UniProtKB/Swiss-Prot annotation:
Parts forming coiled coils: none
Cofactor(s) the protein requires to work: Mg(2+)
Species in which this protein is naturally found: Streptomyces coelicolor (strain ATCC BAA-471 / A3(2) / M145)
Name the UniProt record assigns to this protein: Phosphoserine phosphatase
Signal sequence interval, chain numbering: none
Binding site for substrate: 196, 232, 275-276, 320, 346
Gene Ontology terms for molecular function: L-phosphoserine phosphatase activity; magnesium ion binding
An individual GO BP term: L-serine biosynthetic process
Domain of life of the native organism: Bacteria
Function (record text): Catalyzes the dephosphorylation of phosphoserine (P-Ser) in vitro. Also catalyzes the dephosphorylation of phosphothreonine (P-Thr) in vitro.
Entry keyword set: Amino-acid biosynthesis, Hydrolase, Magnesium, Metal-binding, Serine biosynthesis
Entry keyword Plastid: no
EC number(s) stated in the UniProt entry for this protein: 3.1.3.3
Amino acid sequence: MSASQTSDVPTLLVKIFGKDRPGITAGLFDTLAAYSVDVVDIEQVVTRGRIVLCALVTEPPRGLEGDLRATVHSWAESLKLQAEIISGIGDNRPRGFGRSLVTVLGHPLTAEATAAIAARITESGSNIDRIFRLAKYPVTAVEFAVSGVETEPLRTALATEAAALGVDIAVVAAGLHRRAQRLVVMDVDSTLIQDEVIELFAAHAGCEDEVAEVTAAAMRGELDFEQSLHARVALLAGLDASVVDKVRAEVRLTPGARTLIRTLKRLGYQVGVVSGGFTQVTDALQEQLGLDFAQANTLEIVDGRLTGRVTGEIVDRAGKARLLRRFAAAAGVPLSQTVAIGDGANDLDMLNAAGLGVAFNAKPVVREAAHTAVNVPFLDTVLYLLGITREEVEAADTLADDLGDGPGRP
C-alpha cells in the first residue's frame, strides 16, 4: 500500500479558482510534479466560465513544503488565478451508511427550495457528499449524493418538502443496481400520450361527457376498472370502424416521449407499454416508436362497426402488474431492474411491483404511493431519475445526426 492510500498520511489540499482557460489542470500538476507528491483525490467544476480545481496530494519530502507553496502561488498569480493550500491528515472521511441519491426537479428551481431541501437532508441526519447538475432545461435537475440515513426515511422526510415547495424530489438508493435497470414499462393515456383514448372515441360518438365522468371516477379509484371499461365501451356501440384511423391521427405524444424512448433504446433498455385503452391505438404506437412490448384491451369490430364490447384479456390494475412481470420475464430482467411509469390508480400495482415506480403528473393517491413522482409536463425528465444528463442525451442525438441515422427529434 502506498503512502497516499493510508488514512494518517499528511496531505495538502490545493485549491485553485478563477477564470477558466485551457491548460490549468495540466499546469497545476506539472508544478506539483517537481515535488514528488502523490495524487490522493481530484475534483474540478466549471460554472459560468469560472473554475474551481481541488487537488489533494501527499506532503512533499521534508523541507520542501514551503517551496511548493511559494511555487504554486507564483504559478497561479501568473495566470491571474487564486490559490489556497491547506495542510491536513489523510483523505475524506468514509461516507456513512445509507447512501442515497436525491434528484430535485424544478421549473424553476429556486434558492428557497434548495435551502429547504438541504436543511431537511441535514435534519434527517444525512450529509450531502456531492451535488451535480443533470439538466438546465426543460427543467433544472440537480442530484444530491447523500449518506448517513437509510433511503426510505429520507424519502419520507423529503416528500412533504416537495409538495410544499412545488418541486419534484426523487430519492433512490445509490449503488450498482441503479445502473442495472434494463426495462421500462409505461401507461399510455395521459402518460405516453397527452390524451385519454376512450375520450377521443367518445368525441366521435357524441358521448364525451358521459365517458369523461366515468373515466375520472375510475382513475380516482372510486370505481372498479373493469366495470367502468365495459360501461364506457358500451357507449361506443354502432360507431363506424373508420373512426379508428381518425383517432390514431388525433393522438398527441407527451412532450419528451420520443426523447425518452430513443435514449433508453440507445442505452440497451427494452421499452413497453400497458394500457387500459385499446390495441387499435397501442399497436400503432408500438410500430411508430419501436417499442418492444405493448398490451391493451381490444375493441370488438363486427361488419365494420364497433359492437360496444372488448375481447380477450382485460388489462386492468392487476393486469398491468401481471404484464410488467410477463415483459420482465420475456426480457430476462428481474423486477428489481424495471422502471414503471403511470398516472392513475390502475397503475398502482405496476408501480409498486417495479424496482422504481414513477408517478407522472398523477392523482394524489398515486403520488403518495409511488416510489417517486414527476409533476412537470416532460416525459424525458424520467431520464434524470436514472442519472442520465441532458448533455449526454444531446450528445447522443448529435452523434446520430452526424452518422446519418438520426431518428428525427420531436
